[in-house]
């Protein structure tokens, strides 16, 4: 089965594998000697990402859409909802990220790093709510954190923080401009 970006359906859950933002954080601190130890750790996420091929194969049996997070989840999720002709609610406080980022990235740049940065190569996928136990099973089977970060709506892309609607203007990474 081939997973496309265009299959998301109203009320599907939105998930992401792994943690986001580490590759972008590595780029943000690479020249800052204060964070040389952290950069040494984070650069592996930038230079040697782990492709999620096996879990992608398993997801193809039930997920409704999927995309690799290469341009930042903000931009990649926009691709899913655009091609699926729907919207999404994203709960920013649910998005998993390496807690080291709290120490090295200024608070006002944290979301840009976590959802606007690219090169994570995790998977963002949608699935019918009835498959939530199967998602948990795949997380254990592949020893990969899978986190529900939102749900598909009829229209618009909305971001929430602590259950409050907030305005974000993140473009994500563009390989042709950056």
What are these regions (language model features)?
Residues 1-7, 47, 56, 78, ...:
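A generic local secondary-structure boundary/capping motif
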Residues 17, 28-31, 126-127, 160-161:
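Short beta-strand-to-turn element immediately C-terminal to the catalytic PLP-Schiff-base lysine
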Residues 15-18, 49-73:
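Internal active-site segments that recognize and position negatively charged phosphoryl groups
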Residues 35-41, 52-56, 65-67, 86-90:
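Short, structured loop/turn "capping" segments at alpha-beta junctions
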């Amino acid at each position: 089965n081939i997973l496309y970006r265009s299959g998301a359906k109203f009320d599907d859950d939105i998930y992401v594998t792994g943690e986001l933002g580490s590759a972008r954080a590595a780029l943000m601190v690479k020249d800052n000697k204060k964070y040389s130890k952290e950069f040494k750790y984070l650069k592996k996420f930038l230079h040697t990402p782990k492709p999620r091929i096996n879990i992608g194969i398993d997801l193809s049996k039930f997920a409704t859409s999927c995309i690799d997070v290469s341009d930042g989840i903000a931009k990649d999720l926009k691709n899913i909802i655009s091609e699926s002709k729907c919207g999404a609610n994203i709960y920013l406080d649910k998005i998993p990220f390496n807690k080291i980022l709290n120490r090295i990235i200024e608070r006002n740049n944290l979301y840009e790093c976590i959802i606007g940065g690219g090169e994570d190569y995790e998977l963002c996928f949608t699935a019918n709510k009835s498959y939530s136990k199967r998602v948990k099973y795949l997380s254990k089977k592949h020893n990969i954190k899978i986190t529900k970060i939102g749900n598909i709506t009829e229209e618009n892309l909305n971001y929430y923080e602590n259950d409050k609607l907030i305005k974000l203007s993140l473009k994500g990474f563009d390989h042709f401009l950056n």
